Amino acid sequence: GRPDVKGRKEILEVHAKNKPIGDDVDLQQIAQITAGFTGADLENLLNEAAILAAKQNQAYITQNEINQAMIKVGIGKEKKSKIISEKEKRITAYHESGHAILFHVLPDVGPVHTVSVIPTGAGAAGYTMPLPAKDEMFLTKGKMLQDIMVSLGGRIAEELILDDITTGASQDIKQATAAAKAMVTKYGFSEKLGLINYDDDSDDVFIGRDLAHSKAYGESTASAIDEEVRRIVEDCY
């Protein structure tokens, strides 16, 4: 499994031994805010920070390089060379602001670490990156609903400010749908479907259709699952 905070600090200490770490870098703090990072992620984090420091002819790795490396490892490399219009920048800024505002106001998500309108190598026009969550053994229903709300925040901002919508929310919608699907089929969070595990480990967004196709459940149950997934997402919106 992925290391806990103690394990992450130990991994960071191993990979920091041969690197010039500045006085402002606190490995314990880095360990606390990198929940979900694997050992390889942590190694990459320090390696990327070292490369960034070297490019700037710095004698030591500072917290600034650590922050930049966290973004690269967690989100993907920014494509600063990609030319985007002022209109696209403005749309992206509104979209990402929608995510950031919900990270700020909802109690069980966030806080925000970075908001950017610089495109990433993964194809996103921008990104909003929260501080990684603390190590948790489980998720609550309320936390999952708030995660869905945050995912939909960009689309909401587009509607409210632009009076139009864009394709920029496609990955957000996919994440929201996947979370709602898990709530219904895996975690028993739907009163309508009850405490039954309908999870088939499929990535198919239209879970009901997939279940009906596999003959695992009847058409009525498959339709009920789709309806519940849709209801959860729409209620969060």
Regions found by a protein language model. Give the residues of each.
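Alpha-helical architecture
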Residues: 36, 93-94
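Soluble catalytic regions of large protease machineries
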Residues: 91-93, 100-237
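Secretory-pathway/luminal and periplasmic proteins that interact with or process carbohydrate-rich
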Residues: 76-79, 124
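Short hydrophobic/aromatic residue motifs in ordered secondary structure
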Residues: 41, 98-99
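Catalytic donor/gating beta->alpha subdomain of glycosyltransferases that bind UDP-sugars
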Residues: 49, 61-64, 68, 136-146
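An alpha-helix initiation/capping motif
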Residues: 28, 43, 64-67, 87, ...
